Each structure stands twice: as structure tokens, then as C-alpha cells.
């Protein structure tokens, strides 16, 4: 049996970065809904705080979760019968609607429900036309730029919508475009890549013990929107050789787009660089980038060794450890 939302049900408006629930009080009853009228929705993907969204192709899916009657009552569609709308009214807070939107997305994902409409944003906008009246789940899919990933909160939107509390006008709005377009609520996070430091020892002096080499690694990333520069990695790593050859050390999960400077700060007793002491690169998402250093023996006989000090911040405390070699 289909449940019906009690009379005086809800009308949901999702404005840019906002999730608002609008309901007409009984004393301001709106004219009846034209349930056979076609509607349209313009979804604005572009965002003032996240400039990359203007040009990223973002797939937006609409799922019809409920039909609407002339008097504004909603009846859940077959695929979304498990979502209870009977406890909502004009006093329902946004957090409750967010919870119901999350439940609707869970149903859509786990039950592999086919979207009623799908569009890809162009120049920061996705347009849906000829949409039947009802309540819809707006589900924008994650999108990636070169260095960042964006995820979007799902929400519910009513077609038609009503802006009585904002404008005092109780007319139903069937075209949510232009000034009535709806926005997305994005969350930005880093993509990551790995750094590999390659070291080649061309000549080894067997008279001395192992040859130790220490590298200072500094990585900074500039935010594409705020231009704020933040340190995303700062540490030292080392390698120990007991003969000639090439060895490597990998540093994983450095934010993509970070500018990395690797400096060989200790070349071991009696060894000198045959390459520059500093190498730079940019981290690429889901990839490995490499820098290379080479050394040779300088003919000296002085002994020497090296330790790598590592400081780790965990649960409010710094811990320290010292190792002779950072290689696996």
C-alpha cells in the first residue's frame, strides 16, 4: 500500500549552498497544482568558492521519489516506498530533509534504480526540461579536476516549487531556471600521487662502512581559488648503500598539484654529487613522479654515518623516532 503525506505537505527548495524546506501554512493555501504540467530545472554547478566547477563536466541525476496531487499531497513512487514522509510538515527542519535525501540516495544506489533524467553540466550549468511534477532526488556525481576531487550532497526538490516564505507570493513555480535555479553543495578534497627518489652510486669505497645519503623533502600546494600556499609534506628520508648501483625510496600520498623540492643535504663521508643537489617536480594525481641523484667517491677515507629523525603527530602528541635508512 502506498503511503500518502499528510495534507499541507512540503515543498522543497535547494538554493545554492542551502537546503531549505518551504511549506505553505493553511491560512495561505496556494492554488491547486497543475499535475499534468511540464516543469524544468536548471542546476548550477558553478560555485564562487570553487572556480574549477565552472568547466568540469558534472553528471547530475534526478530520481522521482514521490508523485504530487493537486492539493499538494505526495505519494512515494514504487522504488522509494521505504522512505517515510508521513512525519513531515511545515515545521520539519532541514536536517530531517537531509536525512531523507541521504536515505533516497542509498535506495537509488543499493537498488540500482534507473534515474528519471540525467544531464551533464556545460559551462557550470545542467538543464532538465519536460519534467513531470513530483518530488525528486538531486544526485550529482563526484567529479575530478587535475588535482582535486569534488563530492556533492544529495537533496530533495519539489516540482513545482513555492517561495511563499521568501517572497510572500503563493503561486507555484514550475520552471526552476534563471533566478529560481538550484545550486549544488560541493565539498573539495585532494587527489594524491607518489614521489620516488632515485639514487645512483657510481663508485663505492669498500674500505669504509655503508654510504649514507639524506634528503630533505618539502612539498607545498597553492589553492586554485584562494591562492593560499600550504605545506603538505615536510620530512627527511635516507638511503644506505653497501656497493655501487641504484636504489629508490617512495613517499606515498602527497597531494596532487604540490610543488616538491628534494634536496640532498648529506652525501655521506667521502662522497660527492655528480648531479645537482636539488631537484623539483609536481605531483600528478594517481601517478608516480621521480627525481634522480647520483654520487661518486671522492677518494677520501673519512668515516661517517647518518640518522633520519622522524616526527609523527598522533592523538595530540608528537612522537620521535630515528632510523639509519628510509629505504624499504
Q: Model-predicted segments: where are they?
A:
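Solvent-exposed loop/turn and edge beta-strand elements of beta-rich ligand-binding domains
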Residues: 1-328
Amino acid at each position: 500500500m502506498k503511503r500518502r503525506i499528510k495534507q499541507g505537505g512540503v515543498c522543497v527548495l535547494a538554493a545554492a549552498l542551502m537546503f531549505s524546506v518551504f511549506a505553505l501554512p493553511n491560512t495561505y493555501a496556494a492554488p491547486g497544482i497543475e499535475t499534468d504540467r511540464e516543469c524544468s530545472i536548471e542546476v548550477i554547478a558553478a560555485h564562487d568558492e570553487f572556480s574549477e566547477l565552472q568547466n568540469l563536466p558534472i553528471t547530475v541525476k534526478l530520481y522521482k521519489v514521490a508523485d504530487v496531487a493537486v492539493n499538494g499531497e505526495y505519494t512515494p513512487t514504487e522504488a522509494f516506498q521505504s522512505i517515510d514522509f508521513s512525519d513531515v510538515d511545515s515545521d520539519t527542519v532541514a536536517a530531517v530533509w537531509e536525512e531523507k535525501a541521504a536515505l533516497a540516495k542509498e535506495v537509488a544506489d543499493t537498488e540500482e534504480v534507473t534515474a528519471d533524467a540525467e544531464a551533464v553540466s556545460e559551462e557550470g550549468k545542467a538543464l532538465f526540461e519536460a519534467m513531470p511534477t513530483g518530488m525528486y532526488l538531486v544526485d550529482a556525481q563526484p567529479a575530478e579536476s587535475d588535482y582535486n576531487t569534488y563530492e556533492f550532497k544529495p537533496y530533495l526538490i519539489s516540482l513545482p516549487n513555492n517561495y511563499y516564505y521568501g517572497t510572500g507570493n503563493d503561486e507555484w513555480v514550475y520552471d526552476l531556471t534563471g533566478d529560481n535555479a538550484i545550486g549544488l553543495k560541493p565539498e573539495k578534497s585532494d587527489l594524491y600521487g607518489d614521489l620516488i627518489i632515485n639514487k645512483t652510486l657510481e663508485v663505492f669505497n669498500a674500505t669504509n662502512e655503508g654510504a649514507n645519503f639524506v634528503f630533505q623533502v618539502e612539498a607545498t600546494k597553492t589553492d586554485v581559488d584562494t591562492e593560499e600556499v600550504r605545506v603538505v609534506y615536510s620530512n627527511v628520508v635516507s638511503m644506505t648503500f653497501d656497493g655501487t648501483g641504484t636504489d629508490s625510496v617512495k613517499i606515498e600520498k602527497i597531494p596532487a598539484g604540490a610543488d616538491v623540492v628534494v634536496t640532498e643535504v648529506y652525501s655521506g663521508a667521502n662522497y660527492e654529487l655528480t648531479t645537482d643537489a636539488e631537484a623539483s617536480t609536481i605531483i600528478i594525481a594517481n601517478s608516480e613522479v621521480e627525481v634522480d641523484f647520483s654520487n661518486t667517491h671522492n677518494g677520501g677515507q673519512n668515516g661517517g654515518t647518518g640518522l633520519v629523525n622522524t616526527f609523527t603527530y598522533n592523538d595530540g602528541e608528537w612522537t620521535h623516532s630515528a632510523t639509519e635508512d628510509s629505504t624499504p
